[in-house]
Regions:
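Intrinsic, short, N-terminal disordered tails of RNA polymerase sigma-factor systems
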Residues: 1-240
């Protein structure tokens, strides 16, 4: 991917939006933050802290409710850590003090409502439960998994809305869930396309995927500098 065209200059980080001061914008921005971070937080509580599913679900919801009400995440200082690390550390502190906090949780109010697919997260988690991975590495892996899943969902909506169903099928067959032996040639034969068409169709979907993934990443970082580092690490691109 070349140049800066994939990095919308108008998209502010979720932290900038939360700090903006407008109550409606803060609530909307916090909802975006929850969408990006709830799954890594939930899985971290399940795997690192060994919380049972139901307790981890309650703790995840309560953590974000408390963070919203107490403005914990607004205290982030970018020179000390990456924002995702700060979120994880805040979750750790919350769990350590969860017994004292439980009486103050789930007050509702203006906390943004986000649908959390705990069952889906649990299915993704199952193979991980036999060992306890290094916390930061595991949290990062799940952050990336959630980021990519959101980008794929947006791509599906975009391509289905424009009738590019074959593009999606190729993307799913080659990139999302490839079978042994799959190749551009086998897909071309199966779908009645040329190899060049398969190449071009996949390029379109991948370009859209990276655009949406990078846009989402920009929103979930704590600063422009952090975003540039994360984009370089994940996609090998320079956003300068």
């Amino acid at each position: 991917m070349e140049g800066g065209g994939f990095f919308p200059a108008t998209r502010h980080s979720v932290l900038e939006r939360i700090r903006a001061g407008n109550a409606d914008e803060r609530r909307h921005a916090f909802g975006d933050l929850i969408e990006g971070y709830w799954s890594p937080v939930y899985k971290h509580l399940r795997v690192t802290w060994r919380l049972p599913p139901e307790e981890a679900q309650d703790a995840t919801q309560s953590f974000f409710a408390e963070a919203y009400e107490k403005a914990w995440l607004e205290r982030f200082e970018p020179e000390k850590a990456r924002f995702r690390t700060f979120v994880r550390v805040c979750a750790d502190r919350f769990v350590m003090n969860r017994h004292q906090a439980e009486t103050r949780l789930k007050r509702g109010g203006a906390v943004p409502q986000v649908s959390l697919d705990f069952a889906g997260a649990e299915r993704e988690l199952s193979p991980e439960l036999t060992t306890r991975p290094e916390a930061e590495t595991f949290f990062y892996q799940e952050f990336v998994r959630a980021l990519f899943a959101r980008a794929v969902a947006v791509v599906r909506t975009e391509f289905e809305a424009t009738g590019r169903h074959v593009h999606l099928q190729l993307f799913e067959r080659y990139d999302i869930d490839p079978e042994d032996g799959v190749s551009y040639s086998t897909l071309a034969a199966e779908f009645g396309l040329t190899v060049t068409q398969v190449t071009n169709y996949l390029a379109q979907v991948r370009r859209s995927f990276r655009t949406h993934a990078i846009e989402s990443l920009r929103g979930l970082c704590g600063s422009d500098q952090e975003f540039r580092r994360e984009a370089q690490d994940l996609f090998g691109v320079d956003t300068e």
